[in-house]
Amino acid sequence: LFPISEFLKHITWDSLQDVDAHRQIIYDAIVSYRRMKNQGVVAVFHRDRFDRFSNFARIGEGSLGGKGRGLAFLDHIIKQHPELNAFDNADVMIPKTVVLCTDIFDEFMDTNELYQIALSDIPDEEILRAFLQARLPERLIGDLEAYLDVVRQPIAIRSSSLLEDAHYQPFAGIYSTYMIPYVESRDVRLKMLRDAIK
């Protein structure tokens, strides 16, 4: 909190007559500090502490995957180079990100015995049906609910392939991006989010 107090000590409070203006200055200082502290950090997702100031969080203990690592790297670079944001109306930032690590994927595939189906020659529609009928790891559901309690805007769900990370092989972008619109019902959004993840 010392950076906040350092910022606030330069403000002449006697020139402000409005108590709401005082509150707004303090609030804005705290928000700026929280954003600055969260930038460039890959935080472990904790459902009881996740809030709108969280910038990049991971669920699980496995690898972040290629897209996750790339976004984390860019976020770190942006934090190291504040001059990137020296222009009015041109903020350089990554999208707020939550990554499901590879151990979540492995648990999903193993628990639902999906590897045999995924690697078979059956039609894609049948593979998709099997994935949509499968259950996500139970430990993930509470985290997704906590995430949806905070995020009140459309959500993009991206997937990675191990081959996307391979050198000299242009294999990126073979998986679709799924967009979930914001709707008031958390249950509806949770169903859409679960299906998109699968």
Model feature map: region roles:
Residues L1-K198:
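Nucleotide/phosphate-binding sheet-loop regions of phosphoryl- and nucleotidyl-transfer enzymes
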